[in-house]
Curated annotation (Swiss-Prot):
UniProt xrefs under Pfam families: Multi_Drug_Res
Protein name: Guanidinium exporter
InterPro entries: Small_drug/metabolite_transptr, Small_multidrug_res
Residue ranges annotated as Cytoplasmic topological domain: 1, 49-54, 105
Keyword Metal-binding: no
Organism whose genome encodes this protein: Klebsiella oxytoca
Gene Ontology cellular component annotations, sorted alphabetically: plasma membrane
Length: 105
């Protein structure tokens, strides 16, 4: 169950990371509310997952999901670069996340 909660927390990290772009420095109300809510829930879920998962593993997976998710969202929806080096780097992060999952008891 902790891994599922951590996955959802990571996906919410993507929401708030992308949301930051649309808050315009927290001057736009609706994007700001969505972004802050996603931040709070994401961190609360990360904290809950850390009750049973090692801190280093949980935090690395959470940030990895957020980083990869934000980068992929940027590529697919915001027209950001999808260079081979960038895609390879994202693949390495995913491999690291999988490795952490497989090596955690």
């Amino acid at each position: 169950m902790s891994w599922i909660v951590l996955l959802i927390a990571g996906l919410l990290e993507v929401v708030w990371a992308i949301g930051l772009k649309y808050t315009h420095g927290f001057t736009r109300l609706t994007p700001s509310i969505i972004t802050i809510a996603a931040m709070i829930v994401s961190i609360a879920m990360l904290s809950w997952a850390m009750r049973t998962l090692p801190v280093g593993t949980a935090y690395a997976v959470w940030t990895g999901i957020g980083a990869v998710g934000a980068a992929i969202t940027g590529i697919l929806l915001l027209g950001e670069s999808a260079s081979p080096a960038r895609l390879l780097s994202l693949g390495l992060i995913v491999a690291g996340i999988i490795g952490l999952k497989l090596s955690t008891h």
